[in-house]
C-alpha cells in the first residue's frame, strides 16, 4: 500500500514559488504563488492560502554590515490567496492575489519616520504544464513548467519617491550637495536626498536611509512575466525537489523598472510518517535570489537596488486525507551581497495551506 501511495500521492513540496512582489529584493523573489508539484487532475480545483513574513533590520553597505544607529526596520507580510483549476491531466491555470502589509522605521530628511501601509499587490495569472510524470515502483519523477503574467494592480505611489522631478539630469552634479539639501524646499530636499542615496554620497552610513520607495511599494505599475520550472523526485522515503524562476520586468509607474530577477530553491528530506491518506516529511531547504540594478527614466541606474542572497532552513510538510496539504518553513540568510546601503533580512517564516476539491 505504501508503494502505491508513493506512486500516486501528492508530491510533498513546499507550496513555494515564487511570484514577484515589489519590495526589498529578498522579499521580491522568494514569495509564494501557492504552486504544488502534484500532477493536475482533470476538473480538480485547489484553493490555497500562503503567508511569508520577513523581518529586515540589518543594514549593509556594499555587502558589509554597518551600525543601525536609528533602529531602522522593515516588517513585511505577504499573504497570497490562490485558486487553481486543472484543465486536463497535464495542464492547469492559476490566479494568485497577494495582500501586502508593511511596517517600517526609516530616516527621511534627517528625521526618524515611522509608517505602514497595506493593500492588494500585483495579481498574477499562471499556466502550468507537466510534460514528464514518471512512476516506476519506488521511483517517482515529475517535471513542471509554468509561465504567466503579473498585472499592475497594486498601489505604486511610493515609487514616486524614486522619481523626484529633475533628479535624472542632476545626478552627475549632485555629489557634495548634501548641505544644500537641508535648506531647500520640501520637493528639493526629497530630490537631493534621493540623489545622495542612489549615488552613495552620504558619508555617514549610520545616518543614511536604508529603506526607500521601492522597498515599501505595494505594486510596480508594470506588466511582468514570470517563467519557471520545477523538478520533483522521490525514491522510497527520500525526497528531492528543485525549482527555478526568472521574471522579466517592464517599465512601470513613474518610469521605474525593477530589474529582472532569478529565484531558486532546492530541498532534500525524508518522510517521518507515510500512510495511504496521510504523510509528514521534514526537509532541509536552500534557496536564493538574484536581481540587478533597477532603472528609471532614460535608463538611469539606481545604485541601492542590486541584491544577491542565499538562505537556509528547515521545512515541514504534511498531507491529510489526500485533500489538505500544508507547509511550514523558516529561513535564515547565510550570504547576502548588496549594492550601496540597504536594509537586509535577519529571518523569514513561510506557511501555506491548500485544499483540493
Regions found by a protein language model. Give the residues of each.
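Outer-membrane pore/translocation modules
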Residues: 102-259
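Short glycine/proline- and aromatic-enriched beta-strand/turn motifs that initiate or cap beta-hairpins
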Residues: 25-74, 156, 205-207, 211
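Outer membrane beta-barrel transmembrane domains
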Residues: 58-62, 66-69, 253-357
Amino acid at each position: 500500500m505504501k508503494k502505491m501511495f508513493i506512486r500516486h500521492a501528492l508530491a510533498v513540496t513546499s507550496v513555494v514559488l515564487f511570484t514577484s512582489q515589489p519590495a526589498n529584493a529578498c522579499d521580491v523573489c522568494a514569495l509564494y504563488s501557492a504552486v504544488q508539484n502534484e500532477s493536475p487532475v482533470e476538473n480538480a480545483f485547489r484553493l490555497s492560502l500562503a503567508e511569508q513574513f520577513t523581518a529586515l533590520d540589518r543594514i549593509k553597505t556594499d555587502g558589509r554590515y554597518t551600525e543601525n544607529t536609528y533602529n531602522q526596520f522593515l516588517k513585511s507580510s505577504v499573504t497570497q490567496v490562490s485558486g487553481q483549476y486543472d484543465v486536463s491531466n497535464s495542464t492547469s491555470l492559476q490566479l494568485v492575489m497577494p495582500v501586502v502589509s508593511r511596517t517600517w522605521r526609516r530616516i527621511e530628511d534627517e528625521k526618524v519616520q515611522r509608517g505602514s501601509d497595506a493593500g492588494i499587490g500585483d495579481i498574477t495569472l499562471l499556466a502550468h504544464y507537466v510534460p514528464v510524470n514518471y512512476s516506476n515502483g519506488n521511483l517517482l519523477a515529475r517535471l513542471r513548467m509554468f509561465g504567466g503574467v503579473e498585472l499592475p494592480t497594486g498601489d505604486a505611489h511610493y515609487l514616486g519617491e524614486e522619481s523626484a522631478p529633475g533628479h535624472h539630469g542632476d545626478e552627475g552634479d549632485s555629489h557634495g550637495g548634501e548641505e544644500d539639501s537641508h535648506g531647500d524646499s520640501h520637493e528639493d530636499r526629497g530630490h537631493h536626498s534621493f540623489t545622495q542615496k542612489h549615488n552613495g554620497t552620504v558619508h555617514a552610513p549610520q545616518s543614511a536611509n536604508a529603506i526607500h520607495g521601492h522597498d515599501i511599494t505595494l505594486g510596480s505599475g508594470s506588466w511582468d512575466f514570470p517563467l519557471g520550472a520545477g523538478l520533483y523526485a522521490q525514491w522510497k522515503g527520500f525526497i528531492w525537489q528543485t525549482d527555478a524562476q526568472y521574471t522579466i520586468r517592464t517599465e512601470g509607474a513613474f518610469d521605474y523598472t525593477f530589474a529582472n530577477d532569478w529565484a531558486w530553491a532546492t530541498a532534500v528530506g525524508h518522510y517521518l510518517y507515510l500512510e495511504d491518506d496521510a504523510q509528514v516529511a521534514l526537509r532541509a531547504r536552500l534557496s536564493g535570489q538574484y536581481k540587478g540594478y533597477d532603472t528609471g527614466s532614460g535608463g538611469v541606474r539606481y545604485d541601492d537596488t542590486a541584491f544577491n542572497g542565499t538562505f537556509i532552513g528547515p521545512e515541514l510538510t504534511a498531507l491529510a486525507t489526500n485533500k489538505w496539504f500544508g507547509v511550514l518553513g523558516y529561513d535564515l540568510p547565510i550570504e547576502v551581497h548588496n549594492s550601496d546601503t540597504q536594509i537586509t533580512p535577519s529571518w523569514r517564516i513561510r506557511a501555506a495551506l491548500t485544499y483540493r476539491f
